């Protein structure tokens, strides 16, 4: 996390809800900077950030259980506006003198809220006597309010569904305004931030860009930085931001493991050298990687081999440069908070980027992570701010291990070339059909299965290619994309006709869950 105060910010205290990140997304969408802190370190985070408002998240815990999480008292002593969501409402009530009981009437899913009284938080949105859809997910419920609170809305199973202490600017809801199933939820959060807390909402990528550049210059000084450039959006945006800050003090290294999409490495190198004047080393290590991967079928073993070889190769190239004091990395905010569990204690380990895990310690370098406060969509917006073309920023996610995990079973050069060609044709057809931006991720998979076919007058015995396409918001859940059959037939025909080694194409109609987006 950052180590500085943020004027006009919101602190989100995380009690372990699976949707706490969505609260942060809604706050950011309202143009306001926010940070998530686990409840164990919330007092420290409050003092550091110096926010103008606090939001208390939901939790899988029960407020009636001994030792269940609590908000630090400093929040209620501060005089700042507080918005408690689900568990956040319950712990606020208990800590301020109200009562909560383990629910006999559990409430999950869609519910309807009846507004009984007007409230400052409803301004321009709801009025007394109206009814609105919300999303509930709770077992416990408030049974007695603290002094100063009143009920402003109810549901059939939650008589204290929306409570308010307008004088102290404390608000609590039993439902989840952060999820899309509460249609007016984002506006409620926006009203709390703008109308109740008085925060302007002028946090922008332009402002973030200047702040990040200033911080990088202050951190790096006149020292050297090296950055692992994968060709993905995250590492590319990080590299451009660092380059804007320190110029020629940055050297980027692209380790080409031979597992990238067709022409990808060459295109990335050309773009950054020609258009952004970056000092970029292109290291062709494909023989080294594929040589060790050939015949390896276990997906976890593949990942470990790729990770180890990447570190070894990167380390060797960095030493040739004479070393550096700093390592640039495209860590995002979800990476920072992903490993923070409300049961995990105050000391947490931040997840390392898959490509450079272990490098800072091995090479005695400090990390420069200019994106660690941003979500993925914000990184894309920053990329546009930095001048990256939409065609690059809008590319589908691509895994660090590359085609190795889209080739189940043993890997060989021949299989990788077959897969690379099939994948290129599939993506070409998607673009021609105008579907690329409607799909979260699409790719081909080469199965370790051969089937009998007939081509011309001859019998064939060749591989099966599976096509995958999903829609998603954040990659946490996904549904398969519903193509029309004409498109699938056209793509399959091209692949079979143009790619030697494939004689059958199938389409994967598995959602996540129960499946994962990638096959390995």
Swiss-Prot record:
EC number: 6.3.5.2
GO cellular component, one term: cytosol
CDD domains: GATase1_GMP_Synthase (cd01742), GMP_synthase_C (cd01997)
Binding site for ATP: 230-236
PROSITE patterns, alphabetized: GATASE_TYPE_1, GMPS_ATP_PPASE
Domain Glutamine amidotransferase type-1: 9-202
Every GMPS ATP-PPase domain range: 203-395
Name of protein: GMP synthase [glutamine-hydrolyzing]
Taxonomic classification: Bacteria, Pseudomonadati, Pseudomonadota, Alphaproteobacteria, Hyphomicrobiales
